[in-house]
Every structure is written in C-alpha cells, then in structure tokens.
C-alpha cells in the first residue's frame, strides 16, 4: 500500500471542460499577478484591516477589473462570466479572499452595465475598469439584515436632488470605496416597489464612514458602517428607474450566488491539497500520517465530495454563460458548495491537529 497521498486539485482542471485555452491563459496570468503582487503583502493588509488601494489600480492595468465593461470604456469587452469565475477561483485558491475584486467585478459593476445611462457610463465605467474607482454596494441595515424589502434608509426628492438619510452596516469595500450603490426607499407605499438605487460618491456632504469592523476572519476585506445625514444626491446619480431597485437587486442574485459557490469549491480543493502535503510529511507512531487508513479515507472522501460539488457548480457556470441559470439552481450551488467547504476544511483541520489552529498554516 502506498504511503503517500496525491491531493492535487490542479490535476483535474483539464477534465472540467467548462474552460477553453483563452480562459486558462487568463488564469495563468492572474495567478502570476496574485503570486507576485498580492500574496507578498497580504499578511500586512490582514493586520491593517484593508487592502492597499494600489492593488486595484494594478489589477485594472493588467485587465483583471471590469472584464465585461466595453472596450471603449477601458474594460475587457467580454460578457463571458468564466473570466470572472477564474478570478474567484484563484483568489480563493491562493488564500487571499479579502482581496475585494470579486465584489467589485461580479456584484457592483453589473448594476452600472445594466442600468446606467449613457452619461453615467461615460462618468463611471472608465474608473471602474482602471481601478481608480473602487465600488461597494450598501443594502444591509442594522435593523433589517437580509430583509431587503424592510430597508428603512430614505431618499426624498427635492428638486434635482434626493435627500438621503439612514445607515448601513457590514458594507464590504466600505473604507476603500469611492462610489457606493445605496439601496434607499423613495416611495413609502410599497415594501417591494418603493426602493431605488442611488450612487453616493466619496466626499458628498453628510456621507460618513464609521469604524472598520473587526471580524473573526477576512480581516483585509474592509467592512464598514456607513451613515447618510441629509446627503444631497443628484437625480443624475439614480441608477435605472425610481422604485425598481428591489427588482434590480434580486435580478443579480444568481450571479452573486454563483461567485460564492465557485470560490467555495476552490477553497475546499486547496484545503485538500495542503492537507495531503502535510500528512505526507508529518510522522506519527513511527510512520507518515498518510499511511494511516483513517487519514486516507478522510482525504479521499474530502477530495471526492469536492470534485462532485465542482461538477455541479461548473454546470451552473455553463448555464449562466448561456443565460439559463435560474435563481433557485444558483442557490443550490451556493448551499452545496459552502456546506462542502465547511465539512472539508473542518476534516482537514482535524488532520493537522494543533497546527490546524495556527494562523501560519493556511488551512486555519
């Protein structure tokens, strides 16, 4: 019986079928960018609680931001979401999940692509593609959580401005963000039909950022409380139509869920690979841990479950590229992938013993 375990998650990539040569070339380029520019400074940013802003402009200069933004605005000009998925995979695989490019690319940019006027596109898309503008979206409130229809932040029309009042919390990219898409209530007679999306820009009077929230993980992902006190937001900063914000928010959910699923599979695969390397080297009771039957069963089960989950998520990715991914199927992918990640990482951590609890070991 062999005393080593092959835990390579990379070895299955050629068999997946969802990516082509152009995608893999893009993957290699982005992987090099992470290894040379992001990973070396990541521990510092984790301690400081925020990613250095120049990482966004560097990502933009290499073509890793706004891949779906038209070329005339400095973007990649491709609506192929597989490029976005590669970024989500590689960020997660490299263990730099706090690098907020997925939020910028997959969650924020689509609102500008789908609902911005021509004037707004000229005003904001070039900066979003270059990284000069970092985006965030503010939905969650202290008293509403994920109940979007219960949003209490208000925006009252006053001439050619909306007067915005309210507060948001748990806003990712909240410290770095230059522009924030704020979900606010412009009509009070309908829970679902009275929301609108306003773009609040850095420096607007009455727009304040609270503390950078101290979390148990993803420390470099700046997460802030935001407050709005009589902020005068120009009508020209309304995204889409007034009162249709809830519909806009819900329409992007499948893609947001898919991004999380893709990242979760990559994180689980990386945990399996790291753990396989560890048990091959670590000796206990006179032989490598990899020679213990329980270890082999545990690694094999984690690897199989991750690859099965990956197959389902890849299917969802292909459906999304074809415009056929439903909200419920995307929710299934998110649920399956995150629960698998939880099980796999826990099993891997147990095999590392006390070292699994040490921050210097990536599995932790």
Q: Would you name each region that the model predicts?
A:
Residues 226, 230-248:
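Long, acidic (Asp/Glu-rich), low-complexity accessory segments flanking structured domains
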Residues 150, 203-234:
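Flexible, small-/acidic-enriched active-site or ligand-binding loops
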Residues 169-174, 218, 255-259:
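Glycine-rich phosphate/pyrophosphate-binding beta-alpha loops
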Residues 106-115:
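Helix-loop "lid/cap" segments that line or gate small-molecule binding pockets
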């Amino acid at each position: 019986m062999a005393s080593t375990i092959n835990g390579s998650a990379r070895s299955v990539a050629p068999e997946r079928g969802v990516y082509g040569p152009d995608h893999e070339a893009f993957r290699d380029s982005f992987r090099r960018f992470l290894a040379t520019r992001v990973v070396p400074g990541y521990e510092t940013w984790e301690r400081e609680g925020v990613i250095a802003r120049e990482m966004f402009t560097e990502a933009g200069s290499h073509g890793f931001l706004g891949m779906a933004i038209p070329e005339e605005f400095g973007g990649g000009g491709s609506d192929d979401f597989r490029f976005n998925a590669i970024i989500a995979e590689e960020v997660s695989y490299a263990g730099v999940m706090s690098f907020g490019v997925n939020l910028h690319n997959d969650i924020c940019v689509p609102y500008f692509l789908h609902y911005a006027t021509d004037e707004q596109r000229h005003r904001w898309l070039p900066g979003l593609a270059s990284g000069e503008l970092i985006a965030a979206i503010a939905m969650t409130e202290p008293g509403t959580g994920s109940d979007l229809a219960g949003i209490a932040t208000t925006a009252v029309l006053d001439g050619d401005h909306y007067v915005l009042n309210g507060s948001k919390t748990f806003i990712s990219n909240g410290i770095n963000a230059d522009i924030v898409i704020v979900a606010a209530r412009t009509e009070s007679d309908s829970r679902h039909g009275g929301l609108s999306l306003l773009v609040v820009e850095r420096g607007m009077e009455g727009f304040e950022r609270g503390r950078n929230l101290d979390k148990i993980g993803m420390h470099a992902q700046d997460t802030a409380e935001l407050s709005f006190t009589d902020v005068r937001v120009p009508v020209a900063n309304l995204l889409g139509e007034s009162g249709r914000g809830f519909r806009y928010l819900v329409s992007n959910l499948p893609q947001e869920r898919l991004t999380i699923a893709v990242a979760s599979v990559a994180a689980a695969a990386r945990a399996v690979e790291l753990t396989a390397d560890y048990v091959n080297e670590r000796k206990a009771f006179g032989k490598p841990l990899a020679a213990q039957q329980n270890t082999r069963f545990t690694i094999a089960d984690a690897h199989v479950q991750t690859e099965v989950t990956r197959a389902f998520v890849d299917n969802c990715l292909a459906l999304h590229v074809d415009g056929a991914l439903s909200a419920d199927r995307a929710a299934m992918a998110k649920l399956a992938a995150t629960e698998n990640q939880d099980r796999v990482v826990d099993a891997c951590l147990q095999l590392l013993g006390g070292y699994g609890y040490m921050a210097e070991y990536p599995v932790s």
